[in-house]
């Protein structure tokens, strides 16, 4: 492998700005803003608008719309025979 061409992979804290939920993970993204984590170490802080803590798919607050498929529309239009 070539030296000095790979991005710096480091631990960072992502914070969901909607709920305030934070989680520590590895990333190549950096930030000048830092936060002290539960283990006492300081890590770069990256703010995100949506995470698994606030996304409707993961929270179970998802709204489903009735979407008819082609067959259902055909049967509705011409009646099931």
UniProtKB/Swiss-Prot annotation:
One of its GO terms (biological process) is translation. It comes from Lactococcus lactis subsp. lactis (strain IL1403). This is Large ribosomal subunit protein bL31B. Gene3D superfamilies: Ribosomal protein L31 (4.10.830.30). InterPro entries: Ribosomal_bL28/bL31-like_sf (IPR034704), Ribosomal_bL31 (IPR002150), Ribosomal_bL31_B (IPR027493), Ribosomal_bL31_sf (IPR042105). Belongs to the bacterial ribosomal protein bL31 family. Type B subfamily. It comes from the Bacteria. Keywords: Ribonucleoprotein, Ribosomal protein. Part of the 50S ribosomal subunit. GO terms for molecular function: structural constituent of ribosome. It holds the Pfam family Ribosomal_L31.
């Amino acid at each position: 492998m070539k030296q000095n061409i790979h991005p710096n992979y480091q631990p960072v804290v992502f914070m969901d700005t909607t709920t305030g939920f934070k989680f520590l993970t590895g990333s190549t993204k950096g930030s000048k803003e830092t936060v002290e984590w539960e283990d006492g170490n300081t890590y770069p802080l990256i703010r995100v608008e949506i995470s698994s803590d606030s996304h409707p798919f993961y929270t179970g607050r998802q709204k489903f719309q009735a979407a008819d498929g082609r067959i259902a529309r055909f049967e509705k239009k011409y009646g099931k025979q």
